């Protein structure tokens, strides 16, 4: 399924179409390089995000419908991956990583990927998405401190950086530590 989004190119003010679609096996090599390049100069990175994506694709937590790419002018410029995680027996989603090529950042592509991913996740019946990242950025997509949803990290982290999003508006508050797929190494 294709999800077109109109994006303005800031430098030229041209308008182009951004397509968000499910990742396909033939995209894997390109996505590997997109993720690697997106994190090369990131403030917080272990330099291994591209290998994490490859490992998660082979895991039980992988959800093909929630591995999405952003395509502009027939070029993959972004990728997002949501995988299964668990909080006290309840399946939730872990958003990691979100990658956009440096030349395409600050144009709303990451937010578009999140919005489409959240929509699909809601349709699939998931209640929460959890992310570790910059609060100023992820709050634009509705993420709040995970502690407000009763979700705790399995590691030391400040409250602002560990966030969650209630995908269906339910009042169900969880109470426990998130368990990530073993591919995360946590």
Describe each PLM feature range.
Residues 32-39, 43-81:
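Active-site rim helix/loop that mediates acceptor-substrate recognition in acyltransferases
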Residues 1-16:
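N-terminal amphipathic/basic-hydrophobic helices that include classical n-h-c signal peptides
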Residues 123-127, 132-157:
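Conserved active-site alpha-helix within GNAT-family acetyltransferase domains
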Residues 95, 100, 106-119, 130-131:
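Conserved acetyl-CoA-binding loop-helix of GNAT-fold acetyltransferases
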Residues 19-31:
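A short beta-loop-alpha structural element at the N-terminal edge
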Residues 75, 101-112, 124, 140-141:
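Conserved glycine-rich acetyl-CoA-binding loop
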Residues 152-186:
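C-terminal "cap" of GNAT-fold acetyltransferases
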Residues 85-94, 105, 124:
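A conserved beta-turn-beta hairpin within the catalytic core of GNAT-like acetyltransferases
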